[in-house]
Amino acid sequence: MKKYADYTLPSFFGRVRPSNIWTRGVYYEGLIALYSIYPREDYYSYTYDWANFHKWGMRNGNTTRNADDQCCGQVYIDLYNMCPSDPNMIRNIKASIDMVVNTPQVNDWDWIDAIQMAMPIYAKFGKMTGEQKYYDKMWDLYSYTRNTEGEAGMYNAKEGLWWRDQDFDPPYKEPNGKNCYWSR
């Protein structure tokens, strides 16, 4: 991880960062995780500057239910937990997650990546606040994705693997007649 961050970090300085969706969110998840075990100030500063540049917000605002938009919230929460002096750091992501928590809808995660993009946010808020509602909603969203999304859920219990989304669950098969699974 260190070699990757050291190699790419300078290549992003001075560039406009127009996106606060999953494509950059997952990079910053990794960078802040690296910072937690290898605390170089430039890793923290670069991550903080990115979050601040986006005003600690998400693409499509606080009413988004889209996990791709919410992914950046994982990093915002991590930064806040390192220095919990400014509640504005998590205000937007909390508003978005609270909106989801306070509705009965559970079919938001209709592609497998959504579990990685949004699920940790619910766990982080559950731990931070001590409120069970975050864990309950996380479980409801996860269970629906696993067991119901598409025809019969996106998880193949027999093979222990996940289909990408409902377009790839049975009866879909690859040209070789096998199931098509998703991985990164």
State where each predicted segment sits.
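Glycan-recognition and catalytic cores of secretory/periplasmic carbohydrate-active enzymes
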Residues: 1-184
